[in-house]
Structure formats: structure tokens, C-alpha cells
């Protein structure tokens, strides 16, 4: 089928077993990622909080990014993927949601909120890394004395500039594959959430790219940075590279939707791109950071030869 959407009801064209296999294939990586991110947040902010105090601005912003990923994965594992790939519950649960629309009224805007919040978090962390390397320590501390609060406020409130039209608009159920997903009917026609989300993504890409170019140039010329400082910057450069590649894929796929060249394949690719946004950053961080990896997996020597504390 070229287009899997329907407004009439649950589709009978999709085999239950095959749809359930699609779900299981995704849960294989979604659930371990959910557990990994949960443990990373616990280690950074609770169990070994003191180890991350020296670079607390970076780690606070990164924890917010992890928390947004965690919430995205929670929604995907326990709600969105189930409604999409479990045809057995399609009729009963879609009927329940239509009879109790408050759940969609809350969860659908939150889905966009979490994704936009990650874009703002990415920009904030990239800017923090640039200023850390560009400015003198006293200037850096003076700027981030209030800059951290400003970034936290932006991460919390900027997403509302995207989701406001969803909040005031009527939501409905649109049937995909053997299940369904929520959608909305614009109350303000000129404000397309997807188009503005694409704009925010491009702004996030520009800030991330510029910040990392400046950071890379400084590290290339400077020999004064400590080994630990350079390590954290290399890790964030790798995370930013992954982010930019995923963002390019996101922009390309959404441009295809604007051209009405939409298909089941594009729909699934968009899902996998969002999975990449949520999962690859913590995987890169845990892979490149030996000390954090030891602490998360409760290995011996987690506090020895610490590589995450930066002067």
C-alpha cells in the first residue's frame, strides 16, 4: 500500500503476527536504551554526583537531554509503538481514546514537546562547550552563572512555541498500519507544527555546527587544554556529528512529505531517525567515557583514573 493512513477504522490488511514482530524488533533496542539512560541519569545526578561537580553546567544540561530521551522512549515503549503495531488492541483502545480524549489531549502535545526540547538542549550544550574552550575561566564562570538558568528556562519553555497550536486544536485518531496514531486538525491554519519543527531543527543544526567548528579550531591550536577536557570535547563532537547526520535525514524525509511523496517506508524511517536522536547520544557517551561506563555498569574501579571531571 502506497499510503497506510485511514480515517475509517482499524485496517484488516496487516497480519497481526507480522505487526507484532515489527514491535518486538523495535523493543529489542528501545527497552535496553531506556534502562541505560535511566542508569546514566542516576549515576550522574545521584550516586556519583560529586564526580561531575567540576563540570556541573555541562552535566546538568546533558542530564536534561537524557531525561527528554527517557521520556520519549517511555512514551514509545508503553504507548505509541503499542498502538501502532499491536492490531489486537486497535479497536478497543481507539474506542477508549475517542470516548476519553483527555489522554490524547495530554500525550500528543507532550510528544512534540519532548522532541523540540531535545533540539534546544543540543544547542545549549554545544554553546556551553564552545564558550568553555573560547573564554577565559573567569569569563566562562561569569557568563554561565546566569547562562545556565537561561538555558534551562529555554529548554523548558521554547517547546511551547511549537506545540501551542496543537494544544488549542482538536485531536483525532488516524489509523496507520494495523494500528493508529494521534493527529490534530489545525485551529490556526497558517501555523504548521511540522514545518516549524523543521525550522527549529535547522536552527539547531546551524548552532551545533558553528559551535563545534569554533571548538574544534580552538582545540587544534591550543595545547593548554587538559587531556580530560579534550576528551569531553571529543565525545561531544562525536555526539554532535551523529546529531547533524540524523537531523539531515530528518529534514530530507520531511521535505519528502511536503512534496506529498509519502509512503510506509518514509513513515518508518522517520520513526527510526527519532530513535537515533534518543538512543545514539547516550550510546556514544557511554562508549567513549571509560569512567562513566564503569560507574553505570557497576564495574570495579569506577572512580579511579576519572576521565569525566574537567577543570
UniProtKB/Swiss-Prot annotation:
GO terms for molecular function: transmembrane signaling receptor activity. Keywords: Membrane, Transmembrane, Transmembrane helix. It is found in: Membrane. It holds the Pfam family Srg. Its main location: membrane. It is a multi-pass membrane protein. One of its GO terms (cellular component) is membrane. GO terms for biological process: sensory perception of chemical stimulus. The chain crosses the membrane at residues 24-44, 58-78, 101-121, 148-168, 200-220, 235-255, 266-286. Belongs to the nematode receptor-like protein srg family. This is Serpentine receptor class gamma-6. It comes from Caenorhabditis elegans. The lineage of its organism: Eukaryota, Metazoa, Ecdysozoa, Nematoda, Chromadorea.
Amino acid at each position: 500500500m502506497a499510503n497506510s493512513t485511514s480515517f475509517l477504522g482499524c485496517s484488516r490488511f496487516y497480519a497481526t503476527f507480522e505487526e507484532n514482530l515489527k514491535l518486538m524488533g523495535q523493543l529489542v533496542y528501545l527497552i535496553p536504551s531506556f534502562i541505560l539512560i535511566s542508569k546514566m541519569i542516576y549515576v550522574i545526578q545521584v550516586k556519583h554526583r560529586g564526580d561531575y561537580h567540576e563540570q556541573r553546567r555541562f552535566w546538568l544540561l546533558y542530564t536534561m537531554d537524557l531525561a527528554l530521551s527517557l521520556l520519549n522512549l517511555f512514551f514509545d515503549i508503553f504507548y505509541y509503538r503499542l498502538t501502532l503495531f499491536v492490531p489486537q488492541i486497535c479497536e478497543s483502545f481507539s474506542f477508549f481514546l475517542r470516548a476519553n480524549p483527555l489522554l490524547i489531549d495530554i500525550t500528543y502535545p507532550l510528544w512534540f514537546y519532548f522532541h523540540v526540547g531535545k533540539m534546544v538542549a543540543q544547542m545549549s550544550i554545544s554553546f556551553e562547550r564552545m564558550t568553555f574552550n573560547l573564554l577565559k575561566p573567569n569569563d566562562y564562570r561569569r557568563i554561565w552563572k546566569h547562562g545556565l538558568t537561561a538555558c534551562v528556562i529555554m529548554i523548558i519553555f521554547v517547546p511551547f512555541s511549537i506545540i501551542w497550536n496543537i494544544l488549542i486544536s482538536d485531536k483525532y485518531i488516524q489509523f496507520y498500519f494495523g494500528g493508529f496514531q494521534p493527529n490534530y486538525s489545525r485551529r490556526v491554519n497558517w501555523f504548521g507544527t511540522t514545518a516549524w519543527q523543521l525550522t527549529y531543527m535547522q536552527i539547531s543544526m546551524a548552532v551545533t555546527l558553528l559551535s563545534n567548528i569554533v571548538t574544534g579550531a580552538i582545540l587544534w591550536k591550543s595545547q593548554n587544554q587538559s587531556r580530560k577536557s579534550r576528551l569531553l570535547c571529543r565525545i561531544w563532537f562525536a555526539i554532535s556529528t551523529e546529531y547533524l547526520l540524523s537531523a539531515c535525514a530528518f529534514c530530507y524525509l520531511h521535505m519528502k512529505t511536503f512534496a506529498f511523496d509519502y509512503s510506509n517506508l518514509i513513515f518508518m524511517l522517520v520513526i527510526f531517525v527519532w530513535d537515533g536522536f534518543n538512543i545514539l547520544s547516550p550510546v556514544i557517551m557511554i562508549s567513549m567515557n571509560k569512567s562513566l561506563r564503569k560507574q553505570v555498569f557497576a564495574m570495579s574501579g569506577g572512580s579511579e583514573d576519572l576521565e569525566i571531571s574537567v577543570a
